[in-house]
Amino acid sequence: MARTKQTARKSTGGKAPRKQLATKAWNTLATATGGVKKPHRFRPGTVALREIRKYQKSTELLIRKLPFQRLVREIAQDFKTDLRFQSSAVAALQEASEAYLVGLFEDTNLCAIHAKRVTIMPKDMQLARRIRGERA
């Protein structure tokens, strides 16, 4: 296919128009070889391990701030109406909550490994909480 010269166009805002040349060439190549090429997929577990390494390195909060703040306000409504929170108080609650959840998931994973499994299940979480003494 002959290449055509691209001319500069005035932008009207929004997304830039995509080039059609590459996709046309790709389609003819795919049909000539006998089908559409499948997208690349990693083996099961590879992406999970990559995410584990990524999140173990990071220190940022994993739960979004506004949904957590809404949850805190919703729970506080049950105890007293018209409560106000300093932003630092919500941040401290979020930090403590995430630390608790990470620890609970670590213990849950140990329970699953003890049962000779790699997949955590609700019964692992129940056992972890029971051993901790949080639930009778």
UniProtKB/Swiss-Prot annotation:
GO terms for molecular function: DNA binding; protein heterodimerization activity; structural constituent of chromatin. Keywords: Acetylation, Chromosome, DNA-binding, Methylation, Nucleosome core, Nucleus, Phosphoprotein. It holds the Pfam family Histone. Acetylation is generally linked to gene activation. Can be acetylated to form H3K9ac, H3K14ac, H3K18ac and H3K23ac. H3K9ac could compete with H3K9me and prevent gene silencing. H3K9ac is restricted to euchromatin. Methylated to form mainly H3K4me, H3K9me, H3K18me, H3K23me and H3K36me. H3K4me1/2/3, H3K9me3 and H3K36me1/2/3 are typical marks for euchromatin, whereas heterochromatic chromocenters are enriched in H3K9me1/2. H2BK143ub1 is probably prerequisite for H3K4me. Its main location: nucleus. The modification Phosphoserine is found at S11. InterPro entries: Histone-fold, Histone_H2A/H2B/H3, Histone_H3/CENP-A. The modification N6-methylated lysine is found at K5, K10, K19, K24, K37. Belongs to the histone H3 family. It is found in: Nucleus; Chromosome. The modification N6-acetyllysine is found at K10, K15, K19, K24. The nucleosome is a histone octamer containing two molecules each of H2A, H2B, H3 and H4 assembled in one H3-H4 heterotetramer and two H2A-H2B heterodimers. The octamer wraps approximately 147 bp of DNA. Residues 1-20 are annotated as: Disordered. SMART domains: H3. This is Histone H3.2. It comes from Cichorium intybus (Chicory). The keyword Acetylation applies.
